[in-house]
Amino acid sequence: MIVRNYTNTLLELRTCEARYKLLQERREVYYVKYLGVRSPNIEKIGSGKNWSIDGMSVFLDLVGRVNEQTGMSLDDELELLAHQIAELNTVLKRIRAALRKMEGLEFQLYVAIVIDGKTVTEAVQEIAEKNYISEQAVWRYHLPKIREELEAIRRKK
């Protein structure tokens, strides 16, 4: 169960980070477009007359405008995502600490492969040496027990 929670939390973190990056880029595009060197005042038509608005007010309007899909402005959503990313990182640290304390070859294999980033072969060799068993036994009896979890992680990456 803890392995599945780790995987799901890690994927949720990656999703939040991707969304945060996307929104940061959108905010940057608005900034360059309306406050950049090449963007002086913008002409806007209002009440049948042409009148200009400075770029700062347009930029602030765009980042402060509430998105109908999310119900938040761009700045509010960025702030919320930053908070969620920090929270998920804290949760992942706790899960990693708990996984490292667990006994059992399957958990040791999982930690070596997923958290430490070792290849399956390196992890099997390390676990076999640490626990004084043959590599063949690890390949045959212990690795198949976590293979499904490892495949799920590879598919979701």
Provide a role label for each language-model segment:
Residues 1-98, 152-157:
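N-terminal interaction/assembly modules
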Residues 108, 125-126, 140, 144:
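Preference for long, well-ordered alpha-helical segments
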Residues 117-136:
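Helix-turn-helix DNA-binding module
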Residues 134-148:
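Major-groove recognition helix of helix-turn-helix-like DNA-binding domains
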